[in-house]
Amino acid sequence: EVDAYAIKRIGIPSIILMENAALAALKHIDLVNNIKYTVLVGPGNNGADGLAMTRHLLNYGHHVDVIILGGLSESNPEYMTYYRILERLGVDLTILKEDSTLEDMEKAKLLMKRSDLIIDGIFGTGLNSPVRGIFEYAIDMANNSDVRIFSIDIPSGIDSTTGKVLGTSVNADTVVTFQFMKEGLYKNRDLLGEIFVEPISIPKLAIDKVLK
């Protein structure tokens, strides 16, 4: 992938691309009328993007609740960097796992319903198997919340290449995808809301090398 080339071959730290992605995504959020946010965080880089957006939303003075799904992604250094920053800032970080209590589930549902906007950072372009368990539950809660949903890169649950729904998927009102339009978004564009493509400052060299 283009971003992998930029990171591994050119040496751009992935956290820089995540920061670029977060700031690019925020350009498409109404920061005046949306005051309360719930960010749904999955286990990979898409989740890390969600944590990065959380940090910036806090800097704008907004209230942000974070729901971490499936436990902490401790093997992902960028993810953990953002997590520790938010922890030190005193952000309400709710962790939902398969063995979470009904009380935790109800808390998550209430946080979503109280929000002006839900940010979907559960799964990105790497998803290739059906959504199950706590992730399926969280997506269903978001879809049934009557709150607008903003998806980072691609709505969670959609295969970025085929457009196939892998079990269940987020019904996104807005999608900001990075660097290139994803084929899976093309195939679902009639079912989704607004779709925007934003560059995240990946060098032309990386694009040319990968796509030549």
Spans of features found by a protein language model:
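YjeF_N-associated NAD(P)HX repair module
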Residues: 115-212
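Structural signal for hydrophobic packing residues in well-ordered secondary-structure cores
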Residues: 3-10, 29, 33, 87-90, ...
